[in-house]
A protein has these predicted regions:
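Iron-associated oxidoreductase/ferritin-like identity signal
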Residues: 1-165
Length: 165
């Protein structure tokens, strides 16, 4: 990052890099959770659920790329090893040991709800300190809110289908 850009962030730059790295850990784990969940999914509306999980996986990977770029712009070092993801994660990882679509949806809804909280904290922390990270965090949080809504809509559709049988 340029010296003027870094100086705008000031003394909080190391804390922001730490928060971004924790979010990066979450995004990588979310990417894999969505991707592998799409591969093993079973049950009613599997096709629709798989499409949604694959789409979300792609978007989580995009978030990871945004976070890495911002960490580098701030002069930080992004997490370099997968084992660091488990040490730094805010939201953890839920292996899709039960591939039933309703279980997968619930696991991923919980992940999205955690992600929304993570990005809300980033938005709050960077609002008056780092406008670039603030805008990026707001954009990612908006995506995470949409993901939660998408998954809950699928959950509701499955429930409605069961009730109408």
């Amino acid at each position: 990052m340029g010296t003027v850009g870094r100086s705008l962030v000031g003394k909080d730059v190391d804390k922001i890099v730490e928060l971004l790295n924790k979010a990066l850990a979450d995004e990588w784990l979310a990417y894999y959770q969505y991707w592998i969940g799409a591969k093993v999914a079973a049950g009613p509306m599997r096709g629709a659920v798989t499409v949604e999980l694959e789409e979300h996986a792609t978007e989580e990977l995009g978030h990871a790329l945004m976070l890495v770029d911002r960490i580098l712009q701030l002069g930080g070092t992004p997490l370099l090893a997968p084992q660091d993801w488990y040490e730094m994660t805010n939201c953890g990882y839920e292996a899709p040991e039960d591939p039933y679509v309703e279980v997968l949806l619930e696991q991923n809804i919980q992940g999205e709800q955690c992600a929304i909280e993570v990005y809300q904290k980033l938005v709050d922390f960077t609002k008056d300190v780092d406008p670039v990270t603030y805008e990026m965090s707001l954009q990612i949080m908006t995506d995470e809110i949409e993901h939660e809504e998408d998954l809950q809509a699928l959950q509701e559709d499955i429930q409605l289908m069961k009730e109408r049988r």
